[in-house]
């Protein structure tokens, strides 16, 4: 395919540009502007390469001429004592003629050295002419070329071989360039190693860093210890609606100001647990104390936990805050307690706190939140056994009676079943919303 010029490329259609790119081995599925740019770049590159090849061929031809002249001068000096010389073009070797092979037509005898010199001049002129304008070789020219120097053809390659030679000569040059550009890794590593600090320097630097860090921490802690706000803690009675454990913790956090990282971490963990408890057990918090009358009166004591515990997920240290801790504060009213100290006391581990002593009289004097059962209780064990036996017998009788007449569901049974399904569905949705039940994938 003929490669068009740069001016012709602008006038070509997009489809023609694509076909041209495909034929040249370039990417064709580009936008028109990018494709045109790529083709122009390729054509320029090819033209530059062609010019370089021409320059190389000219330089190689001139070098070949020089070598020819040198070789011819050497051969003249060598062949003056010899009587005759033969040269076969195909084998490219000087052959000493035997008496048997003298009958062949390929040998030419030269007696005088002057004739030999004239022959060589003519040959060199013919070679230059053929190098510039290639023409079909005749038999007469072949005969003339046969009487050339001995090793000239072997040393000087033909036109076909010249391009190969030039390409090969250019390759080692490229290799040399790459060898120069490759970095000396040994030197690089040595320089990098020298830049690195020694172990002693590293330890000194670390010590300085730690000393600076400790001094900064000391400076931060000094204003906290000195400038604590000396305010008496107000006596807390029964918990109001607004004073939930979460709100207490928030107020403590506000009054604290900048506290140490360890206490902050503990506070964060407590906060998380309190939030999770608030999500899971909303009815058992102190905030819903006013809704006691709305509940059913037949509640068991196991469920009633508003007075004893604050929240399900909080540690025992939090539960103690409401009752026993207030007594200690009122007893030691002379001792000043800053908000910072208060938080540390509140965030003690449940292991360090002692269990609260159960007061029987106080618990009995408290009014019941439910109506106790009046009258006789049913016997627990017997009723259980009898129920099981009765159910078993009834089931057998039922199957005996109705194995030929299948039991049809009544509308009431269907309604009850639907209601039960709705209740289960509602409970499941509420559980998922509160994070009690994991959502099914």
From Swiss-Prot:
Record's keyword terms, sorted: Acetylation, Cell cycle, Cell division, Chromosome, Coiled coil, Cytoplasm, Cytoskeleton, DNA-binding, Microtubule, Mitosis, Nucleus, Phosphoprotein, Ubl conjugation
GO cellular component terms attached to this protein's record: chromosome; cytoplasm; microtubule; mitotic spindle; nucleolus
Modified residues (N6-acetyllysine): 411
UniProt feature, compositional bias: Basic and acidic residues: 117-126, 152-171, 409-424
UniProt subcellular location: Cytoplasm; Nucleus, Nucleolus; Cytoplasm, Cytoskeleton, Spindle; Chromosome
Motif (KEN box): 384-390
BP-aspect Gene Ontology terms: establishment of mitotic spindle localization; mitotic chromosome condensation; mitotic cytokinesis; mitotic sister chromatid segregation; positive regulation of mitotic nuclear division
Phosphothreonine carried by residues: 182, 244, 314, 338, 349
Record carries keyword S-adenosyl-L-methionine: no
One Pfam match: NUSAP
Statement: the UniProt record of this protein carries the keyword Protein transport: no
Stretches of the chain forming a coiled coil according to its record: 407-432
Principal cellular location given in the protein's record: cytoplasm
Molecular function (Gene Ontology), one example: RNA binding
UniProt modification remark: Ubiquitinated. Ubiquitination by FZR1 may lead to proteasome-dependent degradation of this protein.
Compositional bias per record (Polar residues), positions renumbered to this chain: 56-74, 100-116, 241-264
Modified residues (Phosphoserine): 124, 135, 240, 247, 255, 269, 276, 311, 352, 363
Residue ranges of the region described as Disordered: 47-186, 216-267, 286-319, 401-427
Subunit and partners: Interacts with DNA and microtubules. Microtubule bundling is inhibited by IPO7, KPNA2 and KPNB1 while association with DNA is also inhibited by IPO7 and KPNA2.
PANTHER family on file: NUCLEOLAR AND SPINDLE-ASSOCIATED PROTEIN 1 (PTHR15874:SF1)
Annotated family: Belongs to the NUSAP family.
Domain notes: The KEN box is required for the FZR1-dependent degradation of this protein subsequent to ubiquitination.
The name this protein goes by in its record: Nucleolar and spindle-associated protein 1
Organism: Homo sapiens (Human)
The organism's taxonomic lineage, starting at the top: Eukaryota, Metazoa, Chordata, Craniata, Vertebrata
């Amino acid at each position: 395919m003929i490669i068009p010029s740069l001016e012709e490329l602008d006038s070509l259609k997009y489809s023609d540009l694509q076909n041209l790119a495909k034929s040249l081995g370039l990417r064709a599925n580009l936008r028109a502007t990018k494709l045109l740019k790529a083709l122009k770049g390729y054509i320029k590159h090819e033209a530059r390469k062609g010019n370089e090849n021409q320059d190389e061929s000219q330089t190689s031809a001139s070098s070949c001429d020089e070598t020819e002249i040198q070789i011819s001068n050497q051969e003249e000096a060598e062949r003056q004592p010899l009587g005759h010389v033969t040269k076969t073009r195909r084998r490219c070797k000087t052959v000493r003629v035997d008496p048997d092979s003298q009958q062949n037509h390929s040998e030419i005898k030269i007696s005088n050295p002057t004739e030999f010199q004239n022959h060589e001049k003519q040959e060199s002129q013919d070679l230059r002419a053929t190098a510039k304008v290639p023409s079909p070789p005749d038999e007469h020219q072949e005969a003339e070329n046969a009487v050339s120097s001995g090793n000239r053809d072997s040393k000087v390659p033909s036109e076909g071989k010249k391009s190969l030679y030039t390409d090969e000569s250019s390759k080692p040059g490229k290799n040399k360039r790459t060898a120069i550009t490759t970095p000396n890794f040994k030197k690089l590593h040595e320089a990098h190693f020298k830049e690195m600090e020694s172990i002693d320097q590293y330890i000194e630097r670390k010590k300085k860093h730690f000393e600076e860090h400790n001094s900064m921490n000391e400076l931060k802690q000094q204003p906290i210890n000195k400038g604590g706000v000396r305010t008496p803690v107000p006596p807390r009675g029964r918990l109001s609606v607004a004073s939930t454990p979460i709100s207490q913790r928030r107020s403590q956090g506000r009054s604290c100001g900048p506290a140490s990282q360890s206490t902050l971490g503990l506070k964060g963990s407590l906060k998380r647990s309190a939030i999770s408890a608030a999500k899971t057990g909303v009815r058992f918090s102190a905030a819903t104390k006013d809704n006691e009358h709305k509940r059913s009166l037949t509640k068991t004591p196991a469920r009633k936990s508003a007075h004893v515990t604050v929240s399900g997920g909080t540690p025992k240290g939090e539960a103690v805050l409401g009752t026993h801790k207030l007594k200690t504060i009122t007893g030691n009213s002379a001792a000043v307690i800053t908000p910072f100290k208060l938080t540390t006391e509140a965030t003690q581990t449940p292991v360090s706190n002692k269990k609260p002593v159960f007061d029987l009289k106080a618990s009995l004097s408290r009014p019941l939140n439910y109506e106790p059962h009046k009258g006789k209780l049913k016997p627990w064990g017997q009723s259980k056994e009898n129920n099981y036996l009765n159910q078993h017998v009834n089931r057998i009788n039922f199957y005996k009676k109705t194995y030929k007449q299948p039991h049809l569901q009544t509308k009431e049974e269907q309604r009850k079943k639907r209601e039960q399904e709705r209740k289960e569905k509602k409970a499941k949705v509420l559980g998922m919303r509160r994070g009690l039940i994991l959502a099914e994938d």
